[in-house]
Amino acid sequence: MSDSARIVAIDHVQLAMPEGGENAARAFYAGVLGLTEMPKPAELAGRGGAWFAAGRVQVHLGVEADFRPARKAHPALQVEGLAALVARCEAAGVTVARDVPLPGMDRVHIADPFGNRIELVERVSTRSGRDAG
């Protein structure tokens, strides 16, 4: 390519939710995962749903009339303190599926209240003592 256009980051991830699920979304994304709800722009507020953020990570939940949860496609949220977050999820009744660790990474899968799959990953030191990130 000869122009200077390039993708530099993911701005947000959008997941679908059923109509009327905003309170369940708040309880899970803010209450369990610890994200902060952010106000939706006035132009989009009437559509329902809710937006959440932690640092530069944004997760948007949008209402979908013919809702079906994403069970394969999923965001992977990088965390610090995976064991503590897993304990918080389990205490809240969220099923945690541990997955095969990858080199330099521990990971688990959970589902939001609507059945959308979410992967939680934490970078861990490799055997050589260097950070895997």
Protein language model features and the residues they cover:
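N-terminal beta-strand motif that seeds the catalytic metal site of vicinal oxygen chelate
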Residues: 1-26, 73-75, 128-133
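A short linear hydrophobic-aromatic micro-motif
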Residues: 37-39, 61, 95-98
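A short beta-turn/loop motif at secondary-structure boundaries
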Residues: 42-45, 66-69, 100-103
